Design a protein with these regions (language model features):
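Active-site "substrate specificity/gating" loop of NAD(P)-dependent dehydrogenases
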Residues: 18-24, 29, 46-47
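C-terminal helical subdomain
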Residues: 54, 73-104, 108, 117
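Residue(s) in the substrate-gating loop at a strand-loop-helix junction
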Residues: 14
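Short, flexible catalytic-loop segment of classical short-chain dehydrogenase/reductase
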Residues: 18, 56-67
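A short helix-coil junction within the Rossmann-fold of NAD(P)-dependent oxidoreductases
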Residues: 1-8
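Alpha-helical segment proximal to the catalytic Tyr-Lys
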Residues: 43-47, 106
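Hydrophobic structural elements of the Rossmann-like NAD(P)H-binding subdomain
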Residues: 10, 52-55, 65, 110, ...
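Active-site helix of classical SDR
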Residues: 30, 38
Length: 122
């Protein structure tokens, strides 16, 4: 990318890296680290026209959330914290990543785009 003086890097973080989670300190710390890496690398690579961003999904329908979704009480508790009232779909996260990789986001760098149905809004 540096030889081409162009490109885009997209990291996958998590909204947990922004708000923390009980019993999830290591995971939260790793995702917070990605957020810092995103911003620092964006500043470092911007002179080479390389953009660096991250997407931070909230709960998404996936293998990672399968146990929580199978436990009705836990699932309803999680949904109560999401203003949009549902888990995200993998395709929704992929759409954001595709946008960040495209020229449509040519003036966006150093950002962590949160896609969590409004969870971190309150």
């Amino acid at each position: 990318m540096q030889k081409q003086a162009a490109g885009s890097i997209v990291f996958v973080s998590s909204q947990i890296g922004l708000v923390g989670h009980p019993l999830g300190a290591a995971y939260a710390a790793s995702k917070a680290g990605i957020n810092g890496l995103t911003k620092s690398t964006a500043v470092e690579l911007a002179p080479n026209s390389i953009r660096v961003n991250a997407v931070a999904p909230g709960p998404v329908v996936s293998d990672m959330t399968a146990k929580a979704r199978a436990d009705k009480k836990r699932y309803n508790s999680l949904l109560a914290g999401i203003p949009m009232g549902r888990f995200g779909q993998p395709e929704e996260i992929a759409t954001i990543i595709n946008f960040l990789l495209s020229e449509a986001s040519s003036f966006i760098t150093g950002q962590v785009i949160v896609a969590d149905g409004g969870f971190t809004a309150h």
